[in-house]
Each structure stands twice: as structure tokens, then as C-alpha cells.
């Protein structure tokens, strides 16, 4: 077929973004031509939206993905090399899950999970396999990706406020920062995310037994053990539950342990005078530009205010159009990052 805009529009309805690619080749005489459709299946989305399955590799060829009106991602196989938006060409989008600061922010929680796992391992009647220390980080990141993907799917927008676990009681009672309209009782269901992650770690180590290999993310992806499959489904459903809670007016409040404190939270901080925020230009926020907060809506301003009032809070803000921001206090400013890696194929984790 001739390669032109008309044929691409005709084929686009049959080439669903998540499952199908349009194949194009360069004929030496006639130039670009459409040779067919390639059915990829949706597994490649797991690297983006979170999930256990692994996808077959893409050929080391030019890929062009239409990610929105006037927006293109250009890549070589899975590696994104450029992004077009608003008529301008940018470098590959920021993927905050690769940033050091976000990994460090959750480091104490990962260590806590490892210590709980090691205690369970000591008490086990049979030998357990060793786990890669990084496994808990990867599982936690995929859980967060699933949560964000679920929120985007509602096309409603929402806010997650992540607070230090030692301050859970303060945020659940009367405080100057926010008021939770629908709070959860301090019991196991509130800490369900944490329970599921630790149970996954214990189950992986148990089913591998005393084999000498170290169990990591690939083993989690490839196992067919029914207990792991059930746990993975439970994480998926929990992520979608929290995503649904985010559609209620107000913020969802969690601790760094992903302990669900409540939803429908109204952010106060009225006394906080905040007129400007810093927009990060790189993963670590070493370079930034100052912007006025009056250019954004109420949802974003309230999320910025609580980060300004309480320096240990992380806000994750989703717009109705699916744009994602992470905001926190850094270098004497509230700084936000645009999480633009929604279609970044290069991110395995």
C-alpha cells in the first residue's frame, strides 16, 4: 500500500495502539510503503503500566508512536530517542522511576520489608532461596505504575498524598495540613499493599527452595506458580481500588509503606503563601525553572501547598488529560517533575 496520511488514517482503527503496529518499509524505487499489520499483543505495556508478564523484544528498527494529538515518540526498537510535542522536538521523556531521589525516598521502607522477610525466613521449617535485594524495589515500582495507570484510565484526574509512616496518626487526626473525610481503621486491610508485597517475597523464596540461584524480577515474571498468580492479581485489584478512590473529590492519602489512610481528603494549608514552584528539567532536579502557581488549577495548587507546608510529603497529581506530576520539597522550593514516560519502552522496571 502507498504510505500516506489517508492510508494511515484508514488503517489506524484496525491498529489499536496497545496491540498492533503498522509495518512500513523503504522500497529502493518507490520509497516508503505499507507492507502490513503486526499484532504485538499488550504485554509490552507491562513495562509502562506495571505487571508481571515479560514482552518479546521489538526488532532493532525505527518505531514511531502517536501518543496524543500532535505528540510523537520516536525510537529504535524499545529505546526512545526523541519526543515531539507542541511543535518542538525534545530528548527522551523523563522517567522518574529511574531517578535516584525517588529510590532513596522509599529506601527505608524497602529495608523494612527485607527485614520482615528475613525474620520469616529464619522461622520457616524448610529452606528458602535468596532474593535479589533489588526485587522489593522493582515490585514496589510496578505496583505504583499500576496505580497510576488505573487512575489515568478513569480520565478523571486525582491526587495521591504520600506521607511518612511515623506521622500516620497525626494525619488521621485533626491537623493543620489536611482532613480525611473517609478514613480507614488501623488494621490489616489498611496495610494490604505491604502485606501483599511481603507475601510475594516470601512465596517466591519458598517455592524456589534451597536452589543456589538468587531469585529476582525475571523469576517473578516467568513463574507459573498459582499462589504467585493470585498474589499478582490481588496487587492489581488493590491498585484499581485505590485508583477508583481517587475519583472522589479530594486526595487519597497513603504512607510510604503504601498504607492506605483514607480518601476524599481536603488539603488546607491556607496560611501557606506559595506563588511560585520550580519545574525540574532533569531526573534529579539539578536544573529547574521557576513558574507561577497561578497558571495551574486548584488540584495542583493544593498539592503544591501541602509539599510547601510539610517538607516530607510527596504529591502525585494527575490531570484529566492523563498528565502526571510528582511534587516535593527540594532545594528551598516546591519542585515538580512531569512524569512523561507513559510510553517509554526502554524502561524495563
Regions found by a protein language model. Name each.
Residues 1-349:
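Divalent-cation
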Amino acid at each position: 500500500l502507498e504510505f500516506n496520511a489517508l492510508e494511515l488514517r484508514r488503517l489506524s482503527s484496525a491498529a489499536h495502539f496497545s496491540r498492533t503496529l503498522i509495518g512500513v518499509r523503504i522500497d529502493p524505487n518507490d520509497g516508503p510503503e505499507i507492507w502490513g499489520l503486526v499484532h504485538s499483543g499488550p504485554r509490552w505495556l507491562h513495562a509502562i503500566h506495571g505487571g508481571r508478564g515479560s514482552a518479546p523484544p521489538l526488532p532493532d528498527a525505527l518505531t514511531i508512536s502517536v501518543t496524543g494529538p500532535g505528540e510523537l515518540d520516536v525510537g529504535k526498537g524499545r529505546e526512545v530517542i526523541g519526543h515531539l510535542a507542541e511543535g518542538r522536538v525534545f530528548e527522551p521523556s523523563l522517567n522518574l522511576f529511574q531517578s535516584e531521589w525517588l529510590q532513596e525516598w522509599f529506601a527505608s521502607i524497602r529495608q523494612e520489608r527485607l527485614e520482615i522477610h528475613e525474620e520469616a525466613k529464619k522461622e520457616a521449617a524448610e529452606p528458602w532461596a535468596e532474593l535479589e535485594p533489588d526485587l522489593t524495589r522493582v515490585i514496589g515500582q510496578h505496583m505504583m505504575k499500576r496505580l497510576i495507570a488505573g487512575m489515568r484510565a478513569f480520565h478523571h484526574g486525582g491526587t495521591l498524598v504520600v506521607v511518612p509512616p511515623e506521622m500516620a496518626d497525626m494525619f488521621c487526626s485533626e491537623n493543620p495540613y489536611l482532613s480525611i473525610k473517609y478514613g480507614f481503621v488501623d488494621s490489616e486491610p489498611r496495610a494490604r499493599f505491604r502485606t501483599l508485597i511481603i507475601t510475594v517475597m516470601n512465596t517466591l523464596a519458598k517455592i524456589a527452595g534451597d536452589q543456589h540461584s538468587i531469585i529476582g524480577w525475571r523469576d517473578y515474571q516467568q513463574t507459573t506458580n498459582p499462589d504467585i498468580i493470585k498474589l499478582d492479581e490481588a496487587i492489581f485489584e488493590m491498585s484499581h481500588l485505590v485508583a477508583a478512590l481517587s475519583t472522589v473529590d479530594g486526595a487519597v492519602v497513603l504512607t510510604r509503606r503504601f498504607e492506605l489512610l483514607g480518601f476524599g481528603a481536603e488539603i488546607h494549608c491556607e496560611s501557606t503563601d506559595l506563588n511560585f514552584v520550580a519545574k525540574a528539567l532533569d531526573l534529579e532536579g539539578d536544573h529547574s525553572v521557576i513558574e507561577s502557581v497561578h497558571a495551574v488549577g486548584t488540584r495542583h495548587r493544593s498539592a503544591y501547598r501541602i509539599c510547601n507546608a510539610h517538607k516530607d510529603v510527596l504529591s502525585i497529581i494527575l490531570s484529566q488529560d492523563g498528565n502526571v506530576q510528582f511534587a516535593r520539597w527540594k532545594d528551598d522550593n516546591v519542585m515538580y517533575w512531569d512524569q512523561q514516560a507513559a510510553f517509554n519502552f526502554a524502561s524495563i522496571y
